[in-house]
């Protein structure tokens, strides 16, 4: 039997998130800016989601985010919030 594929004009949100950024129904980047609260001093720092350098808190000099091959790894204890447009 053929597996039901779903509606091509109205794909589910989950299937759109799994697709490559250029093959989505509406093209959109995977990267974003985010506000990170430092767990030591509660200072808010704006960081790019795919940061390529180590991000350090400006007031207490602790490491907030470390680069990986894709998205930056946020240090445990730090809270983040995605910035809106």
UniProtKB/Swiss-Prot annotation:
Keywords: Metal-binding, Ribonucleoprotein, Ribosomal protein, Zinc, Zinc-finger. InterPro entries: Ribosomal_eS27, Ribosomal_eS27_Zn-bd_dom_sf, Ribosomal_zn-bd. A zinc finger (C4-type) spans 38-60. Binds 1 zinc ion per subunit. GO terms for molecular function: RNA binding; structural constituent of ribosome; zinc ion binding. GO terms for cellular component: cytosolic small ribosomal subunit. Its cofactor is Zn(2+). The keyword ATP-binding does not apply. This is Small ribosomal subunit protein eS27. It comes from Dictyostelium discoideum. The lineage of its organism: Eukaryota, Amoebozoa, Evosea, Eumycetozoa, Dictyostelia. The gene is rps27.
């Amino acid at each position: 039997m053929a597996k039901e594929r779903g509606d091509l004009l109205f794909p589910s949100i989950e299937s759109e998130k799994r697709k490559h950024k250029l093959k989505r129904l509406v093209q959109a980047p995977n990267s974003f800016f985010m506000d990170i609260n430092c767990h030591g001093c509660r200072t808010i720092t704006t960081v790019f989601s795919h940061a390529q350098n180590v991000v350090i808190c400006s007031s207490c000099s602790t490491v907030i985010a470390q680069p990986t091959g894709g998205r930056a790894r946020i240090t445990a204890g730090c809270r983040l919030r995605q910035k809106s447009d």
